[in-house]
Amino acid sequence: HIATFKTTMSAARYVPNVYCYEQIPIPRLYLNSFCPDYYVNITDTIEKKLNSSKAHISQIKKYKSIGLNIIENLEILSKFRGVQAKCKYAEAFKIIKKVW
Protein backbone atom coordinates (compact mmCIF):
# COMPACT_ATOMS: atom_id res chain seq x y z
CA HIS A 1 0.00 0.00 0.00
CA ILE A 2 2.86 2.38 0.69
CA ALA A 3 4.29 1.88 -2.80
CA THR A 4 0.84 2.44 -4.32
CA PHE A 5 0.42 5.63 -2.30
CA LYS A 6 3.81 6.96 -3.38
CA THR A 7 3.14 6.12 -7.02
CA THR A 8 -0.27 7.78 -6.86
CA MET A 9 1.14 10.92 -5.27
CA SER A 10 3.81 11.10 -7.97
CA ALA A 11 1.21 10.67 -10.70
CA ALA A 12 -1.03 13.29 -9.06
CA ARG A 13 1.68 15.90 -8.58
CA TYR A 14 -0.18 18.32 -10.87
CA VAL A 15 -3.61 17.48 -9.49
CA PRO A 16 -4.70 20.26 -7.12
CA ASN A 17 -6.79 18.21 -4.68
CA VAL A 18 -5.95 14.74 -3.37
CA TYR A 19 -8.00 12.94 -0.72
CA CYS A 20 -7.55 9.54 0.94
CA TYR A 21 -10.68 7.48 1.50
CA GLU A 22 -11.27 5.50 4.68
CA GLN A 23 -11.32 1.71 4.47
CA ILE A 24 -13.84 -0.41 6.32
CA PRO A 25 -12.18 -1.51 9.57
CA ILE A 26 -11.44 -5.23 9.56
CA PRO A 27 -10.17 -6.45 12.94
CA ARG A 28 -6.80 -8.00 12.17
CA LEU A 29 -4.22 -5.65 13.44
CA TYR A 30 -6.48 -2.66 13.05
CA LEU A 31 -5.34 0.50 14.73
CA ASN A 32 -7.64 3.43 14.20
CA SER A 33 -5.08 5.92 12.97
CA PHE A 34 -7.36 7.43 10.32
CA CYS A 35 -8.08 11.03 11.30
CA PRO A 36 -10.47 12.52 8.75
CA ASP A 37 -10.68 16.22 8.09
CA TYR A 38 -13.25 16.21 5.29
CA TYR A 39 -16.73 14.62 5.21
CA VAL A 40 -19.31 14.06 2.50
CA ASN A 41 -22.97 13.64 3.41
CA ILE A 42 -24.14 10.37 1.79
CA THR A 43 -27.55 10.19 3.45
CA ASP A 44 -29.33 10.34 0.08
CA THR A 45 -27.14 7.61 -1.44
CA ILE A 46 -26.40 5.20 1.44
CA GLU A 47 -28.77 2.51 0.11
CA LYS A 48 -27.12 2.64 -3.30
CA LYS A 49 -23.69 2.39 -1.65
CA LEU A 50 -24.71 -0.61 0.47
CA ASN A 51 -26.35 -2.36 -2.49
CA SER A 52 -23.30 -1.72 -4.69
CA SER A 53 -21.02 -3.08 -1.99
CA LYS A 54 -23.01 -6.31 -1.99
CA ALA A 55 -21.57 -7.01 -5.46
CA HIS A 56 -18.22 -7.83 -3.80
CA ILE A 57 -19.33 -11.39 -3.10
CA SER A 58 -15.85 -12.84 -2.56
CA GLN A 59 -15.07 -10.26 0.12
CA ILE A 60 -18.42 -10.76 1.82
CA LYS A 61 -17.89 -14.54 1.94
CA LYS A 62 -14.28 -14.19 3.09
CA TYR A 63 -15.13 -12.08 6.12
CA LYS A 64 -18.43 -13.83 6.83
CA SER A 65 -16.42 -17.03 7.36
CA ILE A 66 -14.73 -15.38 10.36
CA GLY A 67 -17.96 -13.87 11.69
CA LEU A 68 -17.83 -10.40 10.16
CA ASN A 69 -20.55 -8.73 8.14
CA ILE A 70 -18.75 -6.09 6.10
CA ILE A 71 -21.99 -4.58 4.77
CA GLU A 72 -23.19 -4.07 8.33
CA ASN A 73 -19.76 -2.67 9.28
CA LEU A 74 -19.94 -0.26 6.34
CA GLU A 75 -23.34 1.00 7.47
CA ILE A 76 -22.16 1.39 11.07
CA LEU A 77 -19.05 3.27 9.96
CA SER A 78 -21.17 5.54 7.74
CA LYS A 79 -23.47 6.28 10.70
CA PHE A 80 -20.49 7.03 12.95
CA ARG A 81 -19.00 9.40 10.38
CA GLY A 82 -22.46 10.92 9.98
CA VAL A 83 -22.50 11.79 13.67
CA GLN A 84 -19.14 13.51 13.25
CA ALA A 85 -20.39 15.37 10.16
CA LYS A 86 -23.74 16.23 11.78
CA CYS A 87 -25.84 14.28 9.30
CA LYS A 88 -27.30 10.76 9.19
CA TYR A 89 -24.61 9.08 7.02
CA ALA A 90 -21.24 10.34 5.80
CA GLU A 91 -18.00 9.25 4.19
CA ALA A 92 -14.75 10.49 5.67
CA PHE A 93 -11.59 11.56 3.90
CA LYS A 94 -8.12 12.78 4.83
CA ILE A 95 -6.99 15.76 2.81
CA ILE A 96 -3.50 15.02 1.52
CA LYS A 97 -3.19 18.02 -0.76
CA LYS A 98 -5.67 20.86 -1.34
CA VAL A 99 -5.47 24.06 -3.31
CA TRP A 100 -7.87 26.51 -1.70
Language model features with spans:
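Metal-dependent de-N-acetylase/amidase catalytic core
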Residues: 1-100
